[in-house]
Amino acid sequence: MSKVCDITGKRPRVGNKVSHANNKTKRRFYPNLQFKKFYVPETNSWIVLRVSTSVIRTINKKGILEVIKEAQRKGTISQLIVG
């Protein structure tokens, strides 16, 4: 299972874990992804997406269809079937 946001394309980043003695070892920073069910009133259906928590807040503010259209314009998602 990939750790990628369906809307924004956020992925794990690579960085360093730094100890108290300033020793550095590689680690991964994972995005906070959640499986979330969204209701689409235009099609009277539900869709399940794996999205970051920041996207959940954006969807609550703008609406699911507006966020999907914006992501398609930006090119982060190619085609998402709603319904």
Curated annotation (Swiss-Prot):
Gene Ontology terms: cellular component: ribonucleoprotein complex; ribosome
Pfam families noted in UniProt: Ribosomal_L28
InterPro entries: Ribosomal_bL28 (IPR026569), Ribosomal_bL28/bL31-like_sf (IPR034704), Ribosomal_bL28_bact-type (IPR001383), Ribosomal_bL28_sf (IPR037147)
GO BP annotations listed: translation
Listed GO MF terms: structural constituent of ribosome
Keyword flag Cell inner membrane: no
The entry's keywords: Ribonucleoprotein, Ribosomal protein
NCBIfam families linked to this entry: L28
Stored PANTHER family: 39S RIBOSOMAL PROTEIN L28, MITOCHONDRIAL, LARGE RIBOSOMAL SUBUNIT PROTEIN BL28M
Family designation: Belongs to the bacterial ribosomal protein bL28 family.
Protein name: Large ribosomal subunit protein bL28
